[in-house]
Amino acid sequence: MEIVELKDDNQEYFLDALLGKEIEKTDFSITEKENFKQNKFKELRNVFSRDNILKFGLMTGEVQIPIEQTDGSVFLATINKEQITKRISKIEEKQRRLIRYVHISTLQVLIKSTFLKGLDTPLELTLRDNRLLNLEESKIAVGHGNLKYGKMKFDVNLQLGLSLKDLDLDRSIILNYKFLRRNFMKEGNHAFSISYRINYALSNSHHSVEFKQKEKIYIDELFSEVLELKHPVFSKLTKSQSLRIEPSPVFEKPLISFKENQKTEEKTVFKPPKRDFELTETSKLKSMISDLTQKVVNLDKKI
């Protein structure tokens, strides 16, 4: 086997290799999951594997929020690119030059008021992916709370891998906050503080977290989780079958009613009256008409 080109730096990873004659003579296929595990293909598997560099860290911060910045127009950036750069500088040079991604696991946010508890002060929080153009689609999480209880806290499990080359990395995952009560505090004062904590990891691959228990990223395992396209569902149906929709009665199933201390009882939605009920009522009406007729006859005789 001969390596034609290998590029591995903080920009990209690329490997091109010519297969040896012993492999060319086999029925090797990259789509067969078991192929790479066979002894005769172990060399190929090792060549196309690469080191998995994964450095975990924790960032935390606390900021004071002036009352004039609580109208929703100001946001808090949760990723500090300068801090990430400092963290990368602590990694040994051989691995440092390969770092390409920052993975965000969990974001925790704690908001604490600077005023007494009990004051009605609703607050709206929106966590956004600010890289997206559509405002609605950029929403990761939306929360509503009230600082009359003194504190608000929420956790968001992000599981995002971001490229360190992103122009907006510092402004990518942001927290918008909006005080819903106006004319609450004089300008120049601070209504609350925001403390945040982020679990993160720096890596050389977008897939590093998936291999966090392993020192290598193996090509066969990397592609084993990719969605496999199956034949269309309608492939076994005739054209008429696939296009036909069978109507079903609206009230096809009985309703189930639960009564306290009683067994489950089934009742249909529309239950037609019994035939004997109809006969009984009809006979009663006939009897009443007959009685009235007789009374009229008796009155005529008296007159």
Swiss-Prot record:
Transmembrane listed as a keyword: no
GO biological process: transport of virus in host, cell to cell
Regions annotated as coiled coil: 272-302
Swiss-Prot/TrEMBL keywords: Coiled coil, Host cell junction, Transport, Viral movement protein
Keyword ATP-binding tagged: no
Gene Ontology CC: host cell plasmodesma
Family: Belongs to the caulimoviridae movement protein family.
Function statement: Transports viral genome to neighboring plant cells directly through plasmosdesmata, without any budding. The movement protein allows efficient cell to cell propagation, by bypassing the host cell wall barrier. Acts by forming tubules structures that increase the size exclusion limit (SEL) of plasmodesmata, thereby allowing viral ribonucleocapsids to spread directly to neighboring cells.
Oligomer and partners: Homotrimer, through the coiled-coil domain. Interacts with VAP.
Protein name from the UniProt record: Movement protein
